[in-house]
């Protein structure tokens, strides 16, 4: 276990920010004020487009946690206990998962300080990120493993608690690829021959691309998103774009939920809009599956469900999708009343996606 002298400046800064936050609560008490904590309202109606950064961020509407009410007082109490835990964790240079924090709270001496659900503890960590301006990774808090992986011509060095490791994301890994760590800022890019990043929603399609040698033939960094991408995955994608100047493309199923996967990569998510500048890659381009692909290739489809239709209509009102391209595609999908999976391309043969669909789309987009 590391001592105080071993902790990094980032760790010290994170701890100081937490202590300052707790001190602010104390000062409010000392001044005879009711303690409060103000955070941006995390709803779709409170995100605005940042013209400078080209990402969606929280607007001016705020919500206030106030000890004037029982529920507000309990939230602030839980915040204080959590700050104490995080401060001690940083002092000892340890880490924990979001799940562990939820269970660990059961050992706290006040029942009112304990979390009732994991969503409650997760949301509090997000609140603390916002008010302290420190990312949860710098609190040494991590989610459960996302399982997201990278395959392609990239040599990197990863810092681990067992020392540094140099890994080539083709030569030194099996077909499963290199697993993205919880904090990708511990990675240093050493060398690469990649021409672009291809983010893939499903594991089945990712495996098809690797088996067909797409990463090798086209010098692609294939990033498996694993559904809605974790923060670590989005951070790595942004770093690959910003630091290696690689174009980023996103390849998903053709349904409204998958379009939101693209949205989280490109524009940022509503839940983490306070980190959009850190996580979002606004230059990312959507490959498909587009509704027009469903029509053009006569792909096997399923009918849209009521929830699909509601989601598409909601996206038409979502500022992240208010572009000519997305409005045209969503209107088309509502008109044809169909959706399709990535693997529906296999109806034209197992090699169609790597020999025809992706090369043609990437050429149209100016990537190849």
Curated annotation (Swiss-Prot):
The active site is at 103 (o-(5'-phospho-dna)-tyrosine intermediate). Keywords: ATP-binding, DNA-binding, Isomerase, Magnesium, Metal-binding, Nucleotide-binding, Topoisomerase. Pfam families: TOP6A-Spo11_Toprim, Topo_VI_alpha, TP6A_N. One of its GO terms (biological process) is DNA topological change. GO terms for molecular function: ATP binding; DNA binding; DNA topoisomerase type II (double strand cut, ATP-hydrolyzing) activity; magnesium ion binding. Its cofactor is Mg(2+). Homodimer. Heterotetramer of two Top6A and two Top6B chains. PANTHER family: MEIOTIC RECOMBINATION PROTEIN SPO11. This is Type 2 DNA topoisomerase 6 subunit A. It comes from Haloarcula marismortui (strain ATCC 43049 / DSM 3752 / JCM 8966 / VKM B-1809) (Halobacterium marismortui). The lineage of its organism: Archaea, Methanobacteriati, Methanobacteriota, Stenosarchaea group, Halobacteria.
């Amino acid at each position: 276990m590391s001592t105080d002298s071993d902790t990094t400046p980032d760790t010290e800064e994170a701890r100081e920010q937490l202590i300052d936050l707790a001190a602010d609560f104390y000062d409010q008490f000392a001044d005879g004020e009711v303690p409060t904590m103000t955070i941006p309202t995390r709803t779709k109606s409170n995100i605005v487009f940042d013209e400078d950064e080209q990402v969606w961020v929280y607007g001016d509407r705020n919500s206030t946690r106030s000890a004037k009410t029982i529920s507000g007082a309990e939230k602030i109490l839980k915040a204080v206990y959590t700050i104490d835990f995080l401060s001690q964790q940083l002092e000892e240079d340890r880490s924990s998962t979001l799940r562990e924090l939820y269970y660990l709270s059961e050992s706290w001496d006040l029942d009112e300080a304990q979390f009732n659900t994991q969503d409650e503890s997760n949301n509090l960590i997000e609140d603390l990120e916002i008010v302290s301006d420190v990312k949860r990774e710098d609190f040494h808090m991590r989610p459960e493993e996302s399982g997201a992986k990278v395959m392609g011509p990239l040599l990197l060095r990863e810092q681990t608690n067992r020392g540094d490791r140099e890994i080539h994301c083709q030569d030194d890994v099996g077909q499963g690829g290199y697993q993205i760590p919880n904090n990708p800022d511990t990675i240093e890019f050493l060398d690469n021959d990649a021409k672009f990043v291809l983010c893939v929603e499903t594991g089945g399609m990712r495996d098809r691309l690797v088996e067909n040698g797409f990463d090798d033939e086209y010098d692609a960094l294939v990033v498996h998103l694993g559904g809605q991408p974790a923060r670590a995955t989005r951070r790595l994608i942004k770093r690959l774009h910003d630091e290696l100047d690689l174009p980023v493309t996103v390849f998903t199923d053709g349904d409204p939920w998958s379009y939101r996967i693209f949205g989280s990569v490109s524009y940022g998510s509503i839940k983490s809009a306070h980190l959009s500048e850190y996580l979002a890659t606004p230059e990312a381009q959507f490959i498909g599956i587009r509704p027009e692909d469903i029509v053009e290739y006569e792909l096997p489809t399923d009918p849209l469900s009521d929830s699909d239709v509601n989601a598409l209509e909601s996206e038409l009102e979502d500022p992240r999708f208010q572009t000519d391209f997305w409005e045209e595609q969503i209107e088309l999908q509502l008109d044809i009343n169909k959706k399709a999976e990535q693997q529906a391309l296999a109806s034209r043969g197992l090699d169609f996606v790597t020999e025809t669909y992706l090369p043609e789309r990437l050429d149209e987009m100016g990537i190849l």
